[in-house]
């Protein structure tokens, strides 16, 4: 896993697994709402009444509807060097 994805992937995966409704703000100001169905290095699949593939380079902010707890190192995640 590259260093740039050490926070992004677990965060998005937690939102996906817990089916947390999210608001995604795009760089042009548009707000999208739904649940994260899937994601990869370049896109997020957002499901509402329809599924939308949103390119990550177009995303400004991802806002969950409720607080989420990320897995800690003691729950199976390996800490990044220097972040322990």
Curated annotation (Swiss-Prot):
Q: Which residues form the Sm domain?
A: 9-68
The Gene Ontology CC terms held by the record are: cytosol
Q: What are the TM regions of this chain, as residue ranges?
A: none
**UniProt keyword annotations, A-Z:** RNA-binding, Stress response
Q: Does the keyword RNA-binding apply?
A: yes
Q: Name one GO biological process term.
A: regulation of DNA-templated transcription
Q: Which CDD domains match?
A: Hfq
Q: Keyword S-adenosyl-L-methionine on this protein? A: no
The entry lists its GO molecular-function terms as: RNA binding
Q: Which PROSITE patterns does this one have?
A: SM
HAMAP family associated with the record: Hfq
Please give the NCBIfam families that the UniProt record associates with this protein: Hfq (TIGR02383), PRK00395.1 (NF001602)
The protein's job, in short, is: RNA chaperone that binds small regulatory RNA (sRNAs) and mRNAs to facilitate mRNA translational regulation in response to envelope stress, environmental stress and changes in metabolite concentrations. Also binds with high specificity to tRNAs.
State how it assembles: Homohexamer.
Family named by the database record = Belongs to the Hfq family.
Q: Which PANTHER family match?
A: RNA-BINDING PROTEIN HFQ
What is the protein name given in its UniProt record? RNA-binding protein Hfq
Q: Which gene encodes it?
A: hfq
């Amino acid at each position: 896993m590259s260093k740039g994805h050490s926070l992004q992937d677990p965060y998005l995966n937690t939102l996906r697994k817990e089916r947390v409704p999210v608001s995604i703000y795009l760089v042009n100001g548009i707000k999208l709402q739904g649940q994260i169905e899937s994601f990869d290095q370049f896109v997020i699949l957002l499901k509402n009444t329809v599924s939308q593939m949103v390119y990550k380079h177009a995303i400004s902010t991802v806002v969950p509807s409720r607080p989420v707890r990320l897995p800690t190192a003691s729950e199976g995640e390996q800490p990044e060097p220097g972040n322990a």
